[in-house]
């Protein structure tokens, strides 16, 4: 299978989600796909109002500690992009959710950003997704210092 020919959605389904599940994240209550971040702008015309669907904002994935307690954002890109091409978007989404951890991936690996700087490194390349326990440990290290 040529990854370069796969869509972003295919990369999510075939590579990114399985990597997160392999790292111990539970698909039913910890991995949320197309997580809504902002409902979008309301457009009013006369007596009618509706949301402008083009302004609705979704994260590709949000990893949650428990339901509705987000811990990290994962932004996916198709394999024609670099691994970290979605990092700026992931960081912006993480700021909206007020979470310290961001990932970007094109299915070949992950770029991980730790805004807590718990281990003194802001961004690093990873071959696999981080576990929930490792993210919690970094968050706790930062809170203790």
Show which residues each predicted segment covers.
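ATP-dependent helicase/translocase motor core
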Residues: 1-145
